[in-house]
Amino acid sequence: MNAHSIMRLDPHVAEDKLYFENKVDGVIAGLCHTDACSAEVQKTSYDEFVHILEGSLSIVLNNGHKENFSAGQTFVIPKGLICGREQSVNTKFYYMRFEDETSQPHDNVQDLGVIRLNPSDTITEITIPDTSQFQGLIPKHYKHSYYTDTTGRFLVAMWNSDPFEREVAPFNRYELMIFLKGSVTLSDNHNISEDFNAHEAAFVPYKAPYKWKSEEYLSKYYCIIMPK
């Protein structure tokens, strides 16, 4: 798999798979299979985005509270959160981690807890700073922000958009996309062209040639890591 191009994530992979890693920017993205297990309560050393494909698990906070997640659900564990994990069934999930030794946890990380994403959460229209990228009509974009780390480099949100087409350009970030509604074609305008629909996932690395074309309203979760 080309580490510098648009990637389709395959939910049917039968074993753990590392899709992408860049240690300089602290980026790790992959698919993980775990058997029934438990992990002791301890302080997390990185920010992590998780989307469950099969099975279920519980995140246990240091006060004993449990947050339960099952297939199709998505959450964020912020760096510094004191928590453990319990699961009674085999579980498969996509993940994206931000491992930056210089970043500090939020002071209120225990109040933040495990952050649950919900496709029915309220979205707000956002300003598009540069509309020159669009070919044809300028769309409206909407967002619900869930989490940003203390460096401002790790960002998780739900993002919705009207149909639009943008010209090919080098991608300015690392992004894992979980599509919730609608469809889109992502391409490099040369060798790669991939159609994505609801419940599918893509990863786009920094500097990859990237073109977007959608013909219907679309909603996705994103986990972004900005390069240094």
Where are these regions (language model features)?
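A short, N-terminal "cap"/entry segment at the start of jelly-roll beta-barrel domains
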Residues: 1-30, 101-153
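Conserved short histidine dyad/triad with adjacent acidic residue
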Residues: 13-18, 25-44, 140-146, 152-172, ...
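Conserved hydrophobic/aromatic beta-strand scaffold that supports enzyme active sites
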Residues: 29-31, 49, 74-76, 156-158, ...
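Well-ordered beta-strand positions in beta-sheet-rich domains
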Residues: 31, 66-68, 82, 158, ...
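Short, conserved beta-strand element in jelly-roll/cupin
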Residues: 43-59, 170-186
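Short hydrophobic/aromatic-rich beta-strand segments that constitute the beta-sheet cores
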Residues: 59, 95, 168, 186-188, ...
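Short acidic-glycine-tyrosine-enriched beta hairpin
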Residues: 63-80, 190-207
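Ligand-binding loop in jelly-roll beta-barrel domains
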Residues: 79-104, 197-200, 206-228
